[in-house]
Design a protein with these regions (language model features):
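Hydrophobic, aromatic-lined core segments that form the binding pocket/scaffold
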Residues: 196-209, 220
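N-terminal signal-anchor module of multipass membrane proteins
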Residues: 2-73
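Membrane helical hairpin/interfacial module
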Residues: 46-128
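Conserved small/polar residues in nucleotide/adenosyl-binding loops
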Residues: 258
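Structural helix-adjacent loops and short alpha-helical linkers that scaffold large soluble proteins
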Residues: 11-15, 69-80, 120-138, 166-182, ...
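Long, well-ordered core segments of solenoidal/helical folds
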Residues: 20-44, 78-97, 131-149, 173-196, ...
Length: 259
């Protein structure tokens, strides 16, 4: 309870405070994370996929904080345990293997975090892996290239993986990147807004996915023409989206936010 109250009092107003919050989160997760495992359990809540996939999801979400921290050059006592988990999870000979993905698979969603890690860290990440382990990582992530998935913000997960491959000097598929962007351009509505797929509504995924991943791509890719478009769309979107939240943090309830 003390730790929870301490985190609630963290104003997150500086980089140091954000790092402190991340380390507190990683420390709390570590109590649920056995050594030499490729997943961990955070409870038995219901999802539309198996417990093994949910446990892989739990591990993967922590990487959205850990990989940027590692890219900054800061050390953390938790890095090695996560790197070991990735090696085990992507090794088809390991009992901890994350498995082959299927259509509309939640594991495809989680691959974006690994794409980010490769994009930010490049060979600083792959240096922790043997040649065989790098091949395993590439092969497991590469399942997303031709995967059957919703035509929606999910397209960005495939883009993030290819961006990671490219930045890390691994084989990548530029045609796959172009194809995914073309799909999303088909439901760009103007003024920075997309629908979350053909004929679907506008919702918080426009901010949390389309523009979030779009700005990562614009920053880390060498695709200057597309980066310019993505930045301009984000700028236009922000002029409207700012009114979805009040000064005290209250936001417009919409779709998943009301569940």
């Amino acid at each position: 309870m003390w730790a929870a109250n301490k985190e609630k009092s963290n104003p997150l107003s500086s980089r140091q405070e954000v790092v402190a919050s991340l380390n507190a989160l990683l420390q709390a997760l570590d109590t649920q994370f056995p050594a030499n495992r490729s997943r961990f359990s955070l409870g038995d809540t219901c999802a539309h996929y198996t417990a093994d996939i949910a446990q892989m999801e739990g591990l993967s979400r922590a990487l959205w904080g850990l990989f940027p921290l590692m890219a900054s050059g800061e050390s953390t006592p938790f890095s090695e345990k996560y790197l070991t988990a990735i090696k085990l999870g992507t090794d088809p000979q390991s009992t901890g293997y994350w498995g082959e993905t299927g259509p509309y698979d939640q594991r495809l969603v989680e691959m974006a975090a690994y794409g980010l890690g490769l994009a930010l860290l490049g060979d600083k990440l792959t240096a922790h892996f043997t040649g065989r382990e790098v091949m395993n990582l590439h092969a497991w992530l590469n399942q997303i290239t031709d995967a059957q998935m919703p035509d929606s913000n999910w397209n960005y997960f495939a883009i993030m993986v290819q961006l990671g491959f490219k930045r890390a000097g691994l084989p990548y598929d530029q045609a796959a990147i172009d194809h995914r962007f073309a799909l999303m351009d088909a439901y760009y509505l103007g003024d920075g807004w997309y629908s979350d797929g053909p004929g679907r509504p506008k919702d918080y995924y426009i901010s949390m996915a389309f523009h979030f991943y779009g700005l990562i791509y614009a920053t880390l890719s060498d695709d200057e023409a597309r980066a310019k478009v993505l930045r301009e769309r984000s700028r236009l979107f922000a002029e409207d989206f700012i009114y979805w939240s009040a000064a005290d943090g209250a936001s417009v309830p919409d779709r998943k936010s009301v569940v």
